[in-house]
Amino acid sequence: GKTICLDYSSINIAKRFHIGHLSTTMIGHSLRRIYDFLGYKTVGINHLGDWGTQFGKMICAYKLWGNEEEVEKGGVNELVRLYVKFHEEAEKDPALDDQGRAWFKKIEDGDEEALRIFNWFKALTLRDTERVYKLLGVTFDSYAGESFYNDKMDRVINELKEKNLLTISEGASIVDLSEDNMSPCIILRSDGATLYATRDLAAAIYRHDTYHFDKCLYVVAYQQDLHFRQIFRVLEKMGYEWAKDCVHVAFGMISYEGQALSTRKGHVVYLEDLLE
């Protein structure tokens, strides 16, 4: 039989599951059930948003204002409260942002305390989100998210270098896509930091190596259209025939009272409130 990978839901760690996640989750889940029914082998992937400086900020907020018992009990709600507080305080005291960055650097460097707290936040988020998935009847085979690809990006960068696809532009390493009428795909920032594109290239290659998919569907909002066109084109340029089997299943965003949803601004409708 043929194998279909479906990348859907893809929640962010330390944020509540809100109504904006409903489209990707239910469209992905529905497609999966249809493919299952048709006899395909399906692999459901929840590509967790579990990397970035915001986790340094979360730890910083926890160290300053958090309480272990309250976080353990309150779970994601308490983490969101701390996150919002951090942003309020950082507006008055910009030095907090530096502290947040320093904590994230600790996570990157494998500091024991930082990793312990980071993994705990992750476990709490999955615990709370699992309740929502149960209500919806949604399951996944893999929760390999952004951090999973940390050690898989060098391979991509080296391969791009070997194939002479990388160009330096304003200090950043890019793949030039001007002949495809697209803006460049940025692989490394000028400070050497990797970006979403680097991770998504690593993820696509890993998925093909691991699952040997016949199709890989990305159920992600239409705003990411250019991003995926860039990724698929770069994979083609790298010589991966299967790039044509990667498909972005785009959908419209849910807005509420005419505004986009933002956890940071507290402008959000939570799914559990809706379902209950």
Please place each PLM-identified region on the residue numbering.
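NTP-dependent nucleotidyl-transfer catalytic core
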Residues: G1-E276
